[in-house]
Amino acid sequence: MKHYSIQPANLEFNAEGTPVSRDFDDVYFSNDNGLEETRYVFLGGNQLEVRFPEHPHPLFVVAESGFGTGLNFLTLWQAFDQFREAHPQAQLQRLHFISFEKFPLTRADLALAHQHWPELAPWAEQLQAQWPMPLPGCHRLLLNEGRVTLDLWFGDINELTSQLDDSLNQKVDAWFLDGFAPAKNPDMWTQNLFNAMARLARPGGTLATFTSAGFVRRGLQEAGFTMQKRKGFGRKREMLCGVMEQTLPLPCSTPWFNRTGSSKREVAIIGGGIASALLSLALLRRGWQVALYCADEAPALGASGNRQGALYPLLSKHDEALNRFFSNAFTFARRFYDQLPVKFDHDWCGVTQLGWDEKSQHKIAQMLSMDLPAELAVAVEANAVEQITGVATNCSGITYPQGGWLCPAELTRNVLELAQQQGLQIYYQYQLQNLSRKDDCWLLNFAGDQQATHSVVVLANGHQISRFSQTSTLPVYSVAGQVSHIPTTPELAELKQVLCYDGYLTPQNPANQHHCIGASYHRGSEDTAYSEDDQQQNRQRLIDCFPQAQWAKEVDVSDKEARCGVRCATRDHLPMVGNVPDYEATLVEYASLAEQKDEAVSAPVFDDLFMFAALGSRGLCSAPLCAEILAAQMSDEPIPMDASTLTALNPNRLWVRKLLKGKAVKAG
């Protein structure tokens, strides 16, 4: 059985209060002065005090082979903040730290270890507040208002480095080669790791490690680093430092899924919902000049305009990409929303998904068999459902304790206001008719003979994304749906969690004393007119799922209060995020892809044209991480996702999968 949780560190604290691994019989940091050793070995060994002021780019990337207690990261973060305070006009503005950890500490052990360094407390408290649950893969933490990014990869580093996307090659400015001593943990210190470090290192990048072991030095030299010994810290005689003095060839394992960014930093975003709002923030944080064109007279009038939307992950035992993406997207979304400096109605009250028939019970049983962390999802028996949700259903299910609901419309509006304060320009009632290349830019033609020219364009306009010649063949479809707004009752007022069944029901919003119940589903429709049939069907589905519940029968939809919207979806339930693929060129270039993979060129795409679409009914869960992925790709920065899952988000995926099998591809 595949496990979807990570085993925590098995440790104890010695007489000095230093954490010691029981499995590796080694300390996490020196009993003497771990903080000073970190400064000497890793910051000094990589000459960061000198390199920070001279760095020619706005971002400095550090990678590390063992996160442990986070001492190296916290020490570096402190030094980076001190550098920024002393050099506010320096080119270097942001720090990106990538670390791999097979056995992460629990939050409690992390906090206990951090008591060793009171001077690091301001930084340690921020790390503890965002410490992720033990799920495999990449967890992105945005710290210090986004000026510091931490990518925590949970799992075996030798496995994870082989799963990294090619876009991370030659991105690392400095390596911290840390971990338990080679004699204690020989499985980590492999030639495979050294080769991966060399592949990821930028030409001119450096490394430092506490060990001076000969096989480590020789392995790093074989990988491509120029190595030298340096005086060790304290009682240690020697340590190793290295430089990547050559430019290694860049491998591309799957060119048909290759992602390209842009050398430009000026962009137009087409849309007015949660996708365009969150992407605007992510790009502004990276120094982009951003303009947003919305077809409506105000934001969030489309699919992002609902009063309440549920936040919980979409899990699947049989779809690895779906499971990996949504579990990590959900945890990122919670961290993101919790630190977002805007107000919006929400309640992280939990979400319970109920097994109301044999099929749904089987699906839930499969999810519960995946060894998920209890922080993510737990089983709940029928007799306990009433206790945790407040209403009787006679159904068992699965509870997502960190889930809940939020107001998408308010979130979108307030995020855009925040983005405007940071420089976003918004143009309302600009309906894009078509776009074309002109002099290395994109010419945008709007209704009413309005025009604009921009270096880069992102299409984030929901179900209308396929209305342009460049996107008309995308395999996406529209789904119209109606959400009913129902007044509360004494029984409904007791509802404490979001209920999911063959529909969903939210607790009442204190702002209006109403609940949301929905939603109808009409594939291929873009009709947003009120439907009395849909209103009654929303009520009837609730009754059918809980036939013994009197409170369900008392739901009143007679006041005809509802909201109709149209979503954009795909048949594999995953978003489309990345370069807009060139359909005609893809068919020509990849006509013989199944037989000629070794000769494949990079994926044919439209230059400087990107898309952020097909969020379906899970946009509140997926949009924050998708915005971060796309902004990182566009900016040529590290992307917080493994290669196979990124492949599953690529807009060309459905075409390429068929071509790889030698099958014909049809548009749409």
Swiss-Prot record:
Residues 270-668 are annotated as: FAD-dependent cmnm(5)s(2)U34 oxidoreductase. One of its GO terms (molecular function) is flavin adenine dinucleotide binding. Keywords: Cytoplasm, FAD, Flavoprotein, Methyltransferase, Multifunctional enzyme, Oxidoreductase, S-adenosyl-L-methionine, Transferase, tRNA processing. One of its GO terms (cellular component) is cytoplasm. It catalyses: 5-aminomethyl-2-thiouridine(34) in tRNA + S-adenosyl-L-methionine = 5-methylaminomethyl-2-thiouridine(34) in tRNA + S-adenosyl-L-homocysteine + H(+). It comes from the Bacteria. Its main location: cytoplasm. Its EC number is 2.1.1.61, 1.5.-.-. Catalyzes the last two steps in the biosynthesis of 5-methylaminomethyl-2-thiouridine (mnm(5)s(2)U) at the wobble position (U34) in tRNA. Catalyzes the FAD-dependent demodification of cmnm(5)s(2)U34 to nm(5)s(2)U34, followed by the transfer of a methyl group from S-adenosyl-L-methionine to nm(5)s(2)U34, to form mnm(5)s(2)U34. This is tRNA 5-methylaminomethyl-2-thiouridine biosynthesis bifunctional protein MnmC. It comes from Shigella sonnei (strain Ss046). The gene is mnmC.
